Amino acid sequence: MTKTDRVCVGAIAGAFGVKGEVRLKSFCTEPTDIASYGPLSTEKGDRSFRVTLTRPVAGGLGARLSDVTTKEEADALRGVGLYVDRARLPSLGDDEFYHADLIGLEVRDTGGALLGRVHAVHNHGAGDILEIAGAVGREGLLLPFTRAVVPTVDLAAGRIVADPPEGLD
């Protein structure tokens, strides 16, 4: 299975409590869906976990992971991304994208000038933001991922057309 066959759906933020529970950060549209995709694996695929959600907690979800029974085991997993086979994820509607599909796409402005490539997708609660790693001679750029600012996403061609707001270009 290649990396593109898998999508990162969450990450372990650290231990929660003293009995092996973890604080889980879900990247799913509906955060609790993370537990419904079956076993989740690490990026390398060397470990997999069944997830049982226990309760909402500050900054995420409390969860139990199969084979994690102590606080020390949970602490050791801090920062580990959790991946699922893309085939187990729901189909997306038009103009919906998995963050993993956007990362690496070339970004050009409406005049064709290269702005860079998508380095990361962030969401701090008010909507997705594309982090564009700058082209030669350009600094990085943060763009709101809205239809007005990003009118075209062409996954097949590997490109995005952006219309940065005045002052950001």
UniProtKB/Swiss-Prot annotation:
Recorded name of the encoding gene: rimM
Entry function: An accessory protein needed during the final step in the assembly of 30S ribosomal subunit, possibly for assembly of the head region. Essential for efficient processing of 16S rRNA. May be needed both before and after RbfA during the maturation of 16S rRNA. It has affinity for free ribosomal 30S subunits but not for 70S ribosomes.
Domains: entry comment: The PRC barrel domain binds ribosomal protein uS19.
InterPro entries: PRC_barrel-like_sf, PRC_RimM, RimM, RimM_N, RimM_N_sf, Transl_B-barrel_sf
Cited HAMAP family: Ribosome_mat_RimM
This protein's name: Ribosome maturation factor RimM
Localization: Cytoplasm
Gene3D superfamilies reported for this sequence: PRC-barrel domain (2.30.30.240), RimM (2.40.30.60)
Organism: Cereibacter sphaeroides (strain ATCC 17029 / ATH 2.4.9)
